[in-house]
Amino acid sequence: MAVGKDKRISKGKKGGKKKIVDPFSKKDWYDIKAPPRSRRARSGRRCHRTAGTKIASDGLNFRVFEVSLADLQNDEDQAFRKIKLRAEDVQGKNVLTNFWGMDFTTDKLRSLVRKWQSLIQAHVDVKTTDNYQIRIFCIAFTKKRPNHTRNFYAQSSQIAIRRKMREIMVKEAQTCDLKELVAKFIPEVIGKEIDEWRSQGIYPLQSTFIRKVKILKAPKFDLMKLMEVHGDYNEEVGAKIREASSRG
């Protein structure tokens, strides 16, 4: 039997072994700065790369990031609120953001739903004093009356309390700018006012929340106003946040 060469052993690889390069080594890191109404000025970091004529800082403008309010406020009780921040300007390695929406987590919404009660929802489109057009969604649930034994449904005539809910939301939003309005969302100022009204109104309510806020239209970018919103920010390290779609 003739002994020949084993081609599988003698054959070498073309080009040799390639050098492994870390893809993040060529990227720039930017600190995402949340407005100072949150307890953590630095809410996360974002990496981006400059390639050819494409500048990394230009690619960050108008990006929308989503972060849990619990991370911004250092308060786990606020974990059910999701805040959207939009990048408005890039200064050096800092990305200055502004409020761009709010929503509830799915598990929080499901936990509010109970048997033997009515869900009442209302929404309005309003314009703030600084010309932000926003859409506010409110939810509330009927509360059991003392003389009721089991269920506490609101009849069709009593569902008209939506009109009063809209009136309160419009009144609170039209008399302040975006910064002041966002400050009302976290302590649930509008929801508490609706609860106070319902004690004198048609039907008792419970679990009244502003569950969602959408920015429909923003005014023309003004750097001076953005700096007024941010003021002086510190270098506190924040939590990672993920990018969200700008739609919805």
Curated annotation (Swiss-Prot):
Pfam families: Ribosomal_S3Ae. It comes from the Eukaryota. GO terms for cellular component: cytosolic small ribosomal subunit. It is found in: Cytoplasm. One of its GO terms (biological process) is translation. Its main location: cytoplasm. InterPro entries: Ribosomal_eS1, Ribosomal_eS1_euk. GO terms for molecular function: structural constituent of ribosome. Residues 1-21 are annotated as: Disordered. Keywords: Cytoplasm, Ribonucleoprotein, Ribosomal protein. Belongs to the eukaryotic ribosomal protein eS1 family. HAMAP family: Ribosomal_eS1_euk (MF_03122). Component of the small ribosomal subunit. Mature ribosomes consist of a small (40S) and a large (60S) subunit. The 40S subunit contains about 33 different proteins and 1 molecule of RNA (18S). The 60S subunit contains about 49 different proteins and 3 molecules of RNA (25S, 5.8S and 5S). This is Small ribosomal subunit protein eS1. It comes from Syntrichia ruralis.
